[in-house]
């Protein structure tokens, strides 16, 4: 049975009670940092701006190295604050230039998440995680087999950007190696709404990483109420993990569809576009799996759905399709569609005047491609154990054959 952990049960990291907790400044966006400097430190707002630039532009975490701060202010910062970035367990480059980091979450060494940098001509995209594991159970995703532990804090989310940007030698507004961020790593971002939105604010802030709103993309499996809330609280690009254009098939791939079927999902996407003149399209991600969702009829269903969406928002190319060849992982029952089937599927969509691209597989030699991230999860569900038993049963059957 596919298990879905609903948002109400997802909890953030427990607060330590053994000693007064210092404020991790990575947990704060500009507004929060200004408030902390005024209320806790009794300092002017511009001091918060200075510190924010030290952290995100120069990658300095030691207050004593922030040379334009006075000695008294540095002492107050040492007393009340800290800058804790994720610990890098390992970093692994791919032959195609993709780079993956395994980052420890917390101090117990039991949980870790993966972050991936994907360079391309004229751009560099960072794929960022939002949870340790995932609260959903999409049947074709490696992360789902690991179960779920907890939401990431704002510091742990923006810390992934900090680690990658520092490694790349990224200098905001000058030498920009990191041009795009996609919330497409481990986890469902909208199940960790507040922390994700706060982190995306830092990504887009000139005192942070200075990315344009359209260059920060949040990908969701389709939490309809949270899409509506996102429309009022942020202005980033929206991507939807669709993977099927009919409810019966999508429910087997994305169990959340049982709660929020395709019609409701598409209506929420239309509301998202209507909510701001800055938004002109939604990207619909469609992972192609051999014999599952890659047949001509599936393409025609998707084309009809995209035309209906364009009509609903009265805009051509409001719905863009990103076809993703399935990336296998150990124990999966799915296979990647053949190149012939992928191109035939795309042609049907293009002939129907649906803007469609095929995502080039990157980083699969280091298990960094879409759907392959799994990290290290102390599972609070039964999913990891169930998947392990499935693998063992499969090995026994293979040995007996």
UniProtKB/Swiss-Prot annotation:
Its cofactor is [4Fe-4S] cluster. One of its GO terms (cellular component) is cytoplasm. Signal peptide: none annotated. It catalyses: adenosine(2503) in 23S rRNA + 2 reduced [2Fe-2S]-[ferredoxin] + 2 S-adenosyl-L-methionine = 2-methyladenosine(2503) in 23S rRNA + 5'-deoxyadenosine + L-methionine + 2 oxidized [2Fe-2S]-[ferredoxin] + S-adenosyl-L-homocysteine; adenosine(37) in tRNA + 2 reduced [2Fe-2S]-[ferredoxin] + 2 S-adenosyl-L-methionine = 2-methyladenosine(37) in tRNA + 5'-deoxyadenosine + L-methionine + 2 oxidized [2Fe-2S]-[ferredoxin] + S-adenosyl-L-homocysteine. [4Fe-4S] cluster binds at residues 134, 138, 141. Residues 120-365 form the Radical SAM core domain. GO terms for molecular function: 4 iron, 4 sulfur cluster binding; metal ion binding; rRNA (adenine(2503)-C2-)-methyltransferase activity; rRNA binding; tRNA (adenine(37)-C2)-methyltransferase activity; tRNA binding. Disulfide bonds join 127-370. Specifically methylates position 2 of adenine 2503 in 23S rRNA and position 2 of adenine 37 in tRNAs. m2A2503 modification seems to play a crucial role in the proofreading step occurring at the peptidyl transferase center and thus would serve to optimize ribosomal fidelity. Belongs to the radical SAM superfamily. RlmN family. This is Dual-specificity RNA methyltransferase RlmN. It comes from Xanthomonas oryzae pv. oryzae (strain KACC10331 / KXO85). The gene is rlmN.
């Amino acid at each position: 049975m596919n298990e879905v952990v609903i948002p109400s049960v997802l909890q953030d990291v427990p607060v330590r009670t053994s000693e007064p907790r210092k404020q991790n400044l990575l947990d704060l966006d500009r507004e929060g940092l200004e408030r902390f400097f005024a209320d806790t430190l009794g300092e002017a707002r511009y001091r918060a701006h200075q510190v924010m630039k030290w952290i995100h532009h120069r990658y300095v975490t030691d207050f004593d190295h922030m040379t334009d701060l006075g000695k008294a202010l540095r002492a107050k910062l040492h007393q009340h604050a800290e800058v804790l970035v994720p610990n890098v367990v390992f970093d692994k480059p791919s032959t195609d230039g993709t780079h993956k980091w395994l980052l420890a979450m917390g101090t117990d060494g039991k949980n870790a998440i993966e972050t991936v940098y994907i360079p391309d001509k004229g751009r560099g995209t960072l794929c960022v995680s939002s949870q340790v594991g995932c609260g959903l159970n999409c049947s074709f995703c490696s992360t789902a087999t690991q179960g779920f532990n907890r939401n990431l804090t704002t510091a742990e989310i923006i810390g992934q950007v900090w680690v990658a940007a520092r490694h790349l030698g990224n200098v905001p507004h000058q030498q920009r190696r990191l041009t795009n961020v996609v919330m497409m790593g481990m986890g469902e971002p909208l199940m960790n709404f507040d922390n994700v939105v706060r982190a995306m604010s830092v990504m887009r802030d000139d005192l942070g990483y200075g990315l344009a709103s359209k260059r920060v993309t949040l990908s969701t499996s389709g939490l309809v109420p949270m899409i509506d809330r996102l429309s009022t609280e942020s202005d980033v690009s929206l991507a939807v993990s669709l993977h099927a254009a009919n409810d019966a098939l999508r429910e087997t791939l994305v169990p959340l569809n049982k709660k929020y079927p395709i019609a409701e999902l598409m209506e929420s996407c239309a509301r998202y576009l209507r909510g701001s003149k800055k938004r002109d399209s939604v990207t619909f991600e469609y992972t192609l799996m051999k014999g599952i969702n890659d047949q001509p009829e599936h393409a025609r269903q998707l084309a009809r759905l995209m035309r209906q969406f364009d009509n609903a928002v009265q805009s051509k190319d409001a719905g863009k399709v990103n076809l993703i060849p399935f990336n296998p992982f150990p124990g999966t029952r799915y296979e990647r569609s053949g190149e012939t089937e992928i191109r035939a599927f795309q042609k049907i969509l293009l002939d129907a005047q649906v803007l469609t691209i095929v995502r080039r597989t990157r980083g699969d030699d280091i298990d960094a491609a879409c759907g392959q991230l799994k990290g290290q999860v102390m599972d609070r569900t039964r999913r990891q154990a169930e998947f392990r038993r499935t693998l063992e049963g499969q090995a026994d059957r293979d040995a007996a054959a």
